[in-house]
């Protein structure tokens, strides 16, 4: 690998992560922890999840469920879960979480979400840790007759352009994806030049209220 590339930016789920970690190359990671000496560029996942959970509570939700994907290399889902638990505790509300593995087949993931509605028919708020899951949950909820946002409010996380184009009404936490990528490139260039680079860079996020959250009165 070292004879083919000069440096690596790792930003997606990849089965070769272990190989990358041991490559004798400058590496920068986006939103995932690989090794203590590898710089990470991330959005403020804790603050974003706090913002999402509080947005649901401010709009009257009392039975909120958090769905997130487990992956050992992704610190962001863990930060989002921690924030969700903390905010729910602060408001003395029950914190319910549904987890799925990152490599969970789509049919199995859908079945898991169907069980969510079966087991918690009174759910009135869902915070999904990614927009794809939020869109899937929105579709399932509507198929079951939930009126969104009158009966059920949903918010995702990512704000990727593709999802916003496909599901423009979805409320979500928007990550500064372009800024993260630009900064990761700068960090990699600095590492390749032998310059000092911070081990962690955290960028702020924003809330897009969309149409799956109620309007605050």
What are these regions (language model features)?
Residues 1-54, 118, 122:
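Alpha-helical recognition/docking segments in bacterial nutrient-uptake
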Residues 6, 61-63, 124:
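Short acidic/polar active-site loop segments enriched in Thr and Asp
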Residues 14, 41-51, 67-112, 127-135, ...:
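Hinge/beta->alpha junction and helix N-cap segments in small-molecule ligand-binding domains
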Residues 53-64:
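Glycine-rich phosphate/diphosphate-binding loops that line cofactor/substrate pockets in enzymes
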């Amino acid at each position: 690998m070292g004879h083919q590339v000069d440096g690596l930016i790792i930003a997606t789920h990849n089965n070769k992560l272990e190989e990358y970690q041991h490559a004798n190359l400058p590496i920068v990671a986006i939103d995932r922890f690989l090794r203590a000496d590898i710089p990470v560029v991330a959005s403020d996942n804790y603050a974003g999840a706090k913002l999402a959970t509080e947005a649901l509570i401010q709009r009257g939700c009392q039975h909120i469920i958090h769905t997130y994907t487990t992956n050992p290399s992704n610190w962001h889902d863990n930060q989002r879960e921690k924030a969700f638990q903390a905010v729910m505790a602060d408001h003395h509300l029950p914190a319910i979480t549904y987890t799925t593995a990152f490599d969970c087949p789509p049919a199995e993931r859908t079945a898991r979400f169907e069980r969510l509605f079966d087991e918690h028919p009174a759910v009135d708020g869902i915070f999904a840790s990614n927009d794809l899951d939020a869109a899937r949950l929105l579709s399932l909820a509507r198929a079951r007759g939930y009126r969104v946002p009158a009966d059920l409010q949903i918010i995702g996380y990512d704000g990727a352009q593709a999802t916003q184009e496909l599901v423009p009404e979805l409320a979500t936490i928007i990550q500064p994806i372009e800024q993260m990528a630009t900064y990761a490139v700068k960090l990699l260039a600095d590492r390749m030049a032998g310059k000092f680079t911070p081990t962690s860079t955290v960028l702020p996020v924003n809330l897009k209220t969309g149409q799956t959250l109620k309007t605050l009165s």
